[in-house]
């Protein structure tokens, strides 16, 4: 589950490839991100070691809403729920019956999930960005400008203007690929979706 924590707490196809650079990359990414005020999707996640060995496979559902709200539910057998109400993040582990609550770090280079739900107007202050377009797919590679981050690089891919997948690479070369499907954008989502009621008797850890 380390990769989900890292994300939340953040065959070649034929066709013409177009690369962009500089401020145009920033503008394109910002426009695509801000286009979706809410996103609902299923996700599947694969984590690979530096040598390509499969370390973990999980799946689940996620909902995000600007500004700063997100809900990620990873299915059993490694069930976990991560919820942000815009101020705090609650991580619920049902196996341990334990809830961990911490203040939301609004810095994009510390909580990459906020790319989908936070304020991205100053994204260029946190990352160097490069983009590549191939047919209906637009890829963006983001590299943190500082070294005090949880990952070395982050790739975000859009298909027909909607989020398609993300890939995080950490300092030891471990790769986490997250594929989204059944994506719905700009649906009405109540704020109550992002409130987690901790079960009675559960252990609560505040960081």
UniProtKB/Swiss-Prot annotation:
Family annotation (InterPro entries): LolA/LolB/LppX, OM_lipoprot_carrier_LolA-like, OM_lipoprot_carrier_LolA_Pbac
Subcellular location as annotated: Periplasm
SUPFAM superfamilies given in the database record: Prokaryotic lipoproteins and lipoprotein localization factors
Subunit structure: Monomer.
Cellular component terms (Gene Ontology): outer membrane-bounded periplasmic space
Cited function: Participates in the translocation of lipoproteins from the inner membrane to the outer membrane. Only forms a complex with a lipoprotein if the residue after the N-terminal Cys is not an aspartate (The Asp acts as a targeting signal to indicate that the lipoprotein should stay in the inner membrane).
GO biological process, one term: lipoprotein transport
Signal sequence region: 1-21
Chief place where the protein resides: periplasm
Keywords assigned: Chaperone, Periplasm, Protein transport, Signal, Transport
Family: Belongs to the LolA family.
Any Pfam family the entry gives: LolA
Domain of life: Bacteria
Listed name of the protein: Outer-membrane lipoprotein carrier protein
